[in-house]
Amino acid sequence: MAQRPVYPFCAIVGQEEMKLALILATISPDLSGVLIRGEKGTAKSTAVRGLAALLPQHREIPGPYHLSPDEYPTHAVALNLPEVMPEPRTVQVPVVELPVGVTEDRVTGTLDMETALREGRRRFEPGLLAAAHRAILYVDEVNLLDDHVVDLLLDSAAMGVNTVEREGVS
C-alpha cells in the first residue's frame, strides 16, 4: 500500500496552541490525549499526521499489540503470546484512525466465543485500542461517535488498560 505524503508539522502556520498541545501529549503520556476543536480545513488531521512523522522510530515486537521488547515478558502470558520473544523490528509511530461508525467490539476487540466453546480455549481478536498501543489514536468527528464508544475511550484513557469480558469470560 502506497503511503501518502505527509505535510511537515513545522510548516503549519499558526495554530500554535494546537501544536503545543500535541507536542506536550507526546512528551508526557500522563496527559492521556488532546481534544482538538476547529472548523474544517484548520489543519487538525494534518498536524497529527505531521507530528507522527516527526516522532522517533521505536522498536516493537511484531503482532497486534505493538509491545516494546521490555513489555513483552510481562504481557506474554496474559495475552497468550509465544514464550520466546520474536525478533523486534523498528517502526515509525503509526496513526490509527477511529472511524465514525465504529462498534464497541471493533474498538476494544472481541473474545471469540466459538473457539472457546469448540476448543475450550480463549481466543481474543484485538481491536483498534490494541493497534493504537504506542501509537497515536486519531478520532475525527468525536461528536458523531456513539456515547458508549466515547465512554469506552475515556475509561481506557483514564485507566490505562482495557479489559474485554463476554459472558463471564475475560
Please report, for each region that a protein language model flagged, where it lies by residue.
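Conserved ASCE/P-loop NTPase catalytic core
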Residues: 2-170
